[in-house]
A protein has these predicted regions:
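Internal/C-terminal transmembrane anchor helices
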Residues: 329-363
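Hydrophobic alpha-helical membrane-embedded segments
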Residues: 158-162, 195-223
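Membrane-interface segments at the starts/ends of alpha-helical transmembrane spans
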Residues: 139-145, 179-198, 257-263, 289-303, ...
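Alpha-helical transmembrane segments and their helix-start/interface "positive-inside/aromatic belt" motifs
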Residues: 139-159
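Charge-rich cytosolic interhelical loops and cytosolic tails of multi-pass membrane proteins
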Residues: 217-265
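Tandem repeat scaffolds
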Residues: 4-138, 368-666
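Membrane-helix interface motif
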Residues: 164-182, 285-286
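Membrane-embedded alpha-helical segments of integral membrane proteins
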Residues: 267-324
Length: 666
């Protein structure tokens, strides 16, 4: 009894007018978010048996205040400091105490006190009614975290498995869409495309499910005291890797933390918030080599969603676990969203630009497409990824995409029986594919722009309508291969073996085919303008209606080739061998035929206007008339048959006889 009297004597009184003024100023302070008004300070004030129904004392200083027997029903005491306050026999029906500091306070005998109103409070050394004091918070936390722990470890294990698969993924398996997990019995159950597009979606859904469970857990924890009577905290009753996420949001835990607690918080945050975005980033990075725009954009979207969750969820958790804080002054919604999502927007834009730059751009290596400078904008994305030591284009050097022939039968029949790989419409831009094996491969409409396939084996491969712009196919074996309607501008096929290949309707403008073997090839209506065919073997090839303007066919072998209706305007044919070739209605306007051998060639109706026949051997040519030679103006030093020479001199009125060569002895 003496203790109660002394406590009452220590408290100071306050008039009703002063109390009303304090409450009014405090209300303004709360409503303005602390920008105006005065925060109430009623420390040590005697308010015993006062009628304080519905008052708003949120965040007020009420240390050692005497509320014994007072009516505080429906009052707002959120976040108030009530250290050693006397609340005995007070009416606390509907009173909001969330976030209040009740350390050492006396609430014994208080009426209407409910544990659900004590969320985030500090109850250390407080005296509570028996019904409230017996509440077991440890059991509630253990039950709430059980399922969350299972999902947490499922995410970690899934990300670990995915990281291992990504680390062991080769470009060959990625291109072939082979099994992502090759040791499974059903080897085709999880193809690469399914794994790289399905696994990220699964991880994101699992990640979001986990954090929705955590939000429910944080909500349950927010309904519990932050500090119990014995000084324990809820985090001690749950696993550290989950509780550490909420530690910095609890008012009574974040003020004094040990280095170990800081390390736990950082590690827990990295694992819970950033393990999924980082894993999705590696999915995106590894999948770039497949050059699949749709799949890559899906990765960018999933990464953006995960980054948005990782950056926004801590703010949501803070609002859930700190209910005693003052409400912030309302702001325009767009700036708030922009501030919260700025990391997400920046990462999404960066990944999109890198993806577009890789799939539509070119490698950082200046030796590829040397006509483009090293600072060209199309190289920026590859140069950016090169800083982390990653080349975003496939490297399948010396790989075998098609199986070898059965029983080691390398005869023509055995090679023709090989079942080639199906890679129709595959994107292999700027891939490194030196000495690869593509026999009978299906590459319809494949994109091989800038690809390096030197010495590759493409026998019987189908590259119909393929894009081969600037590709390097020197010394390839491509007998019987199909290049119909392919876009092979500026391709390098020097020294290639294209015996019996079909290049009809192909665009080989500015291509390099020097020393290539095109014996018996079908090249109907091919576009070879400005192409280099130095010493190329075109014997028995079909080049009807071909476009060969300004092409170089010096020293080329054109024996028995069919150039009917071909356009050879301005073509360099010096030293070429036309023996027994067919050139019906061909256009040789301004062509250079110096030293060419046209013995036995069929030249009926061919146009030789402005052609240079100096040193050319036209003896035995079929269908060649004096009118054709007169049109050239450069026939005088050509080797002609005697009758053709006389007819030409008579028609052209030559002032100088044509060179007929040595007379054969009789």
């Amino acid at each position: 009894m003496s203790a109660e009297i002394s406590a009452a004597d220590e408290s100071r009184g306050i008039s009703l007018l002063d109390l009303a003024e304090v409450l009014d100023q405090h209300k303004i302070w709360v409503e303005s978010g602390g920008e105006s008004g005065i925060k109430a300070d009623l420390c040590g004030v005697n308010l015993a048996r006062a009628d304080l129904t519905g008052v708003n004392l949120q965040g007020a200083f009420l240390n050692k205040a005497n509320f014994r027997g007072a009516d505080l029903s429906l009052a707002n005491l959120r976040g108030a400091s009530m250290v050693q306050a006397d609340l005995r026999d007070a009416n606390l029906l509907g009173t909001e105490l969330r976030g209040a500091n009740l350390m050492g306070a006396t609430l014994y005998g208080a009426e209407g006190l409910w544990v659900g109103r004590l969320g985030s409070t500090n109850l250390f050394d407080a005296m509570l009614p028996e019904a409230v004091a017996t509440f077991d918070g440890a059991k509630a936390i253990a039950q709430a975290t059980r399922f969350s722990q299972w999902i947490y470890f499922l995410i970690l294990s899934s990300c670990a498995v995915c990281a291992v698969v990504i680390a062991f993924t080769t470009d060959v398996r990625l291109v072939l869409n082979s099994s992502a997990i090759p040791f499974l019995r059903a080897s085709n159950a999880v193809p690469m495309s399914g794994f790289y597009l399905g696994a990220p979606l699964f991880i994101l859904l699992l990640y979001l499910r986990f954090h929705f469970l955590l939000l429910r857990l944080w909500g349950n924890m927010a309904a519990l005291p932050s500090v119990f009577i014995d000084g324990n905290t809820p985090e001690k009753d749950g696993p550290w890797f989950l509780m550490a996420l909420a530690r910095r949001h609890f008012r009574w835990m974040r003020d004094s933390r040990s280095p170990q607690a800081i390390l736990e918080t950082v590690l827990a945050s990295l694992l819970a918030y950033w393990i999924a975005p980082v894993t999705l980033f590696f999915f995106w990075l590894r999948y770039l080599a497949r050059q699949d725009m749709r799949g890559t954009l899906l990765h960018v979207l999933l990464i953006s969603l995960s980054v948005a969750a990782a950056t926004c969820l801590p703010t949501v958790v803070s609002r859930v676990l700190r209910p005693g804080d003052l409400p912030r002054k309302s702001k325009a919604i767009f700036p708030v969203m922009l501030s919260t999502l700025k990391v997400t927007l920046l990462s999404a834009c960066l990944l999109f630009l890198l993806s577009f730059g890789v799939i539509r751009g070119m490698p950082a290596d200046s030796s590829i497409a040397p006509e483009m400078t090293g600072s060209d904008i199309r190289r920026w994305a590859a140069q950016g990824l090169q800083f982390i030591g990653f080349r975003p284009y496939a490297d399948v050097t010396e790989a075998s995409f098609s199986p070898f022939p059965a029983h080691g039968d390398w005869s023509d029949e055995g090679v023709a029986a090989i079942r080639g790989v199906r890679l129709n419409q595959m994107n292999l831009r700027y891939a490194r594919a030196y000495h690869t094996f593509w026999v009978n491969a299906r590459l319809w409409r494949a994109n091989l722009e800038g690809a390096y396939l030197s010495e590759a084996d493409l026998r019987g491969a189908n590259l119909r309508e393929a894009r081969l712009h600037n590709a390097v196919l020197d010394r390839v074996r491509a007998g019987r291969a199909v290049f119909v309607s392919s876009d092979a501008r500026a391709i390098n096929m020097s020294g290639a073996d294209l015996t019996g290949a079909d290049l009809s309707y192909g665009i080989f403008e500015a291509a390099v085919l020097s020393n290539a073997k095109l014996f018996g090839a079908s090249m109907y209506a091919i576009d070879l303008r400005d192409a280099q065919l130095l010493r190329t073997d075109l014997s028995r090839a079909d080049l009807r209606d071909a476009k060969l303007e300004r092409a170089v066919l010096a020293l080329a072998n054109l024996q028995n080739a069919d150039f009917s209706a071909a356009k050879l305007i301005g073509t360099n044919l010096t030293g070429a061998r036309f023996k027994d070739g067919i050139f019906l209605d061909s256009n040789f306007k301004n062509a250079d035929l110096r030293g060419a051998v046209l013995t036995g060639a069929i030249l009926r109706d061919a146009n030789f206007e402005g052609a240079n026949f100096e040193g050319a051997d036209l003896r035995g040519a079929i269908g060649l008339s004096a009118e054709q030679l007169c049109a050239s103006g450069h026939w005088r030093w050509a080797q002609l048959d005697g009758d053709l020479q006389a007819a030409t001199q008579a028609r052209c009125g030559a002032s100088q006889p044509a060179f007929t060569g040595p007379t054969s002895p009789n």
